[in-house]
């Protein structure tokens, strides 16, 4: 899949690439607006040691956004995510208060004192090594931006400070760097909150206030430190579109603002302004293809305010909730007549996630016709402002985890209303492991770990195999805490002769017991008193180890391969059974694959 790649090498999350149609001849992808040095880009993605055919180094689908390895021998080009500042208040204010309206002189956008609020973020990243989960990858550095929102806080993109080990910030016109701390990351909305303790950093700074959602064709100004120079850059354009948009970093779908102002590598994290000098959002990604140009995306202030309110309410970020249903449009008259839907409205429930609260009140075949008394059209849209419509999922995104929604449905021709508690989606294969190391356990050289999107990306899709990829893309969790556990690799030793070539295979059972997650597997192994350890894999493959011989070989294997522990720290904790429904295991993983928006099927969509 081709994508426009500059010398700085745009970086793209694998989950951000969307296939628009069955034809691969019209490629397009979302990329984060961050810059990379030419030399750093060649090293940013280390190949798997077991990969027979290394992937192209500059393939944007195999790189993480916003990361630049520091090369002292070849000074990196500046990579910018911009930031605005606000003074540290003596009187503590609510973070959500900064969404209040504040009229600003339009000329102030070009005033030096206003631009001084923009700061540059310097981040050192140390990402986990998902192929060798007991260690981390070599550290690298990146630069970005953030803007001050008051009370000693900075706002930036989550991908700017992902897997951070050190964060520093520097104001415009200042040669000093100040240590910053990441307070919270919202991966799904690509927003992070930083704090700076130094009083000197905040001298002369003014807080930035958030404005309203703009209108179509409103002027917009994007400020930042993009590639091409060290000083601040200002670009202008107009609002082209406002709709539910795919967020590349979080693999989520939230409200987004499309603009035609140039957003280049380095603009991530920088504010976008209207003509009144109000911040209407945060620049975070661009849309690249051979047929388009100047399509940038801004996180609107409604999403920013939701993030801040969530953090303020809970003391942590709980994430955006979902309804947990797969929906189909009802545009066909015969389909509506068959379902006894009298009017041109509603969307059909095709599947309900077992882990969602909707599974208690909604059924396949129900037609959702309203959400909190707002009518849902047959195309899955609801009224939005004057003379506009927007995807039904927008209403769900306005809720918080734990909120209750009233759903109007038609079931077998009968109108009903049900209440559903909205909770964050449970991913069978997580898109991110934010903080900490991946879980793993090593048994006689057999390395077991949960399947995750970062692992798939690191291993390359070709080495993962079609079956695992299908489950990762299409399957849903049957219960909270469920994982797909795989045998990642085998560390060769005489105790595991004959199994050395096994890798990336799903383990289904241990001594006849179905595996629920990696912690469950570790628990079963610890409790085992049988003579043999029997692992059953996909495709009916089996591996048998003698228990006492395996235990005796463990220390030798760890020493030979320089591994500090046979398991990750989280697996040392007592095991808690995640299943609250004993019938959940009767349903096979992946037996009923479903589609999702990223695959490009326009008729079915998760909400």
Curated annotation (Swiss-Prot):
Residues 41-104 are annotated as: Disordered. It is an enzyme of class 3 (hydrolase). It is found in: Plastid, Chloroplast thylakoid membrane. Keywords: Chloroplast, Hydrolase, Membrane, Plastid, Protease, Serine protease, Thylakoid, Transit peptide. InterPro entries: DEGP_PDZ (IPR041517), DEGP_PDZ_sf (IPR046449), PDZ_sf (IPR036034), Peptidase_S1_PA (IPR009003), Peptidase_S1_PA_chymotrypsin (IPR043504), Peptidase_S1C (IPR001940). Residues 87-104 have a biased composition (Basic and acidic residues). It is a peripheral membrane protein. The active site is at residues 159, 190, 268. It comes from Arabidopsis thaliana (Mouse-ear cress). It comes from the Eukaryota. PANTHER family: PROTEASE DO-LIKE 2, CHLOROPLASTIC (PTHR45980:SF6), PTHR45980. This is Protease Do-like 2, chloroplastic. Induction: By high salt, desiccation and light stresses (at protein level). The gene is DEGP2. Residues 118-317 are annotated as: Serine protease. Belongs to the peptidase S1C family. Residues 308-403 form the PDZ domain. GO terms for biological process: chloroplast organization; photosystem II repair; protein catabolic process; proteolysis. Serine protease that performs the primary cleavage of the photodamaged D1 protein in plant photosystem II. Its EC number is 3.4.21.-. GO terms for molecular function: serine-type endopeptidase activity. One of its GO terms (cellular component) is cytosol.
């Amino acid at each position: 899949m081709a994508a426009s790649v500059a010398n700085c090498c745009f970086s793209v999350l694998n989950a951000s690439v969307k296939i628009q149609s069955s034809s691969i001849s019209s490629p397009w992808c979302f990329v984060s607006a961050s810059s990379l040095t030419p030399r750093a880009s060649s090293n940013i993605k280390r190949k798997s040691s077991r990969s027979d055919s290394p992937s192209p180094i500059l393939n944007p689908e195999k790189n993480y956004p916003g990361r630049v390895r520091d090369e002292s021998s070849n000074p990196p080009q500046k990579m910018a995510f911009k930031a605005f500042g606000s003074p540290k208040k003596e009187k503590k204010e609510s973070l959500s208060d900064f969404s209040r309206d504040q009229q600003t002189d339009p000329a102030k956008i070009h005033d030096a004192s206003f631009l001084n609020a923009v700061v540059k973020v310097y981040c050192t990243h140390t990402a986990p090594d998902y192929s060798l989960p007991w260690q981390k990858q070599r550290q690298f550095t990146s630069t970005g931006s953030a803007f001050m929102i008051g009370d000693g806080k900075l706002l930036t993109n989550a991908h700017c400070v992902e897997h951070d080990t050190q964060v520093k910030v520097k104001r415009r016109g200042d040669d000093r760097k100040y240590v910053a701390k990441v307070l919270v990351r919202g991966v799904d909305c690509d927003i992070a909150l930083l704090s700076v303790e130094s009083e000197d950093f905040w001298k002369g700074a003014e807080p930035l206030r958030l404005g309203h959602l703009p209108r179509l064709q409103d002027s917009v100004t994007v400020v930042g430190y993009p590639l091409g120079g060290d000083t601040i850059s200002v670009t202008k354009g107009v609002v082209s579109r406002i709709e539910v948009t795919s967020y590349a970093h979080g693999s989520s779908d939230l409200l987004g603002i499309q603009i035609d102002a140039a957003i280049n590598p380095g603009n991530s994290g920088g504010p976008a302004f209207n003509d009144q000098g109000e911040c209407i959002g945060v620049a975070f990604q661009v849309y690249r293809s051979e047929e388009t140009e100047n399509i940038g995306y801004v996180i609107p202030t409604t999403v920013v305010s939701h993030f801040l309110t969530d953090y303020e309410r809970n003391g942590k970020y709980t994430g955006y909730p979902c309804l947990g249903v797969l929906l189909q449009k009802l545009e066909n008259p015969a389909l509506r007549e068959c379902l006894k839907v009298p009017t041109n409205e509603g969307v059909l429930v095709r599947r309900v996630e077992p882990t969602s609260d909707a599974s208690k009140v909604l059924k396949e075949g129900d037609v959702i016709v309203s959400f909190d008394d707002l009518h849902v059209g047959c195309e899955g849209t609801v009224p939005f402002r004057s003379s506009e419509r927007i995807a039904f999922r927008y209403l769900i995104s306005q809720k918080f985890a734990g909120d209750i929604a009233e759903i109007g449905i038609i079931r077998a021709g009968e109108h009903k209303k049900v209440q559903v508690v909205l909770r964050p989606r449970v991913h069978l294969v997580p898109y991110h492991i934010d903080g900490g190391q991946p879980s793993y356990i090593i048994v006689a050289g057999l390395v077991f770990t949960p399947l995750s999107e970062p692992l798939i990306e690191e291993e390359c899709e070709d080495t993962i195999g079609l079956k695992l990829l299908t489950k990762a893309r299409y399957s849903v969790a049957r219960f909270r805490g469920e994982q797909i556990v795989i045998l990642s690799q085998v560390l060769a030793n005489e105790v595991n002769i004959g199994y050395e070539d096994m890798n990336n295979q799903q383990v289904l059972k241990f001594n006849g017991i179905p595996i629920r997650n990696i912690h469950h597997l570790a628990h079963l192994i610890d409790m085992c008193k049988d003579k043999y350890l029997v692992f059953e894999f996909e495709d009916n493959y089996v591996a048998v180890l003698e228990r006492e011989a395996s235990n005796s070989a463990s220390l030798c294997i760890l020493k030979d391969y320089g591994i500090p522990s046979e398991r990750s720290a989280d697996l040392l904790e007592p095991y808690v059974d995640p299943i609250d429904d004993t019938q959940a295991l009767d349903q096979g993983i992946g037996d009923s694959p479903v589609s999702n928006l990223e695959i490009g099927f326009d008729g079915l969509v998760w909400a």
